[in-house]
């Protein structure tokens, strides 16, 4: 379960990042004052992200932190009825 939520979070970050004029991982990392490999780890679902870093990422992407946790709009990951 833990790995699943990390993967979903990473997919959401990537989806929003690419929808913002194809923002690169490097540019996002710069805007967040984080390392590019940290962003890469997040997007691959291998990094556990702190609330502080979720806030930094959401600000850099111009979204609310809750938007990064809304997994209903990722590919096949729709809420089950």
Swiss-Prot record:
SUPFAM superfamilies per the UniProt record, alphabetical: lambda repressor-like DNA-binding domains (SSF47413)
GO function terms (MF aspect): DNA binding; DNA-binding transcription factor activity
HTH cro/C1-type domain residues: 13-68
Biological process, per Gene Ontology: DNA restriction-modification system
UniProtKB keywords: DNA-binding, Restriction system, Transcription, Transcription regulation
Gene Ontology CC: one annotated term: cytosol
DNA-binding region: 25-44
Function summary: May help modulate methylase (M) and restriction enzyme (R) expression as cells undergo physiological changes such as sporulation or transformation.
Tree of life domain: Bacteria
Protein name: Control protein C.BamHI
Family matches, as InterPro entries: Bact_TransReg_Diox, Cro/C1-type_HTH, Lambda_DNA-bd_dom_sf
């Amino acid at each position: 379960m833990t790995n699943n939520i990390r993967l979903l979070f990473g997919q959401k970050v990537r989806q929003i990042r690419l929808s913002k004029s194809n923002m690169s991982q490097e540019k996002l990392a710069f805007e967040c004052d984080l390392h590019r490999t940290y962003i890469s780890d997040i997007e691959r679902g291998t990094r556990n992200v702190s609330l502080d870093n979720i806030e930094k990422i959401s600000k850099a992407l111009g979204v609310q932190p809750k938007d990064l946790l809304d997994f209903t709009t990722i590919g096949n990951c729709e809420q089950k009825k």
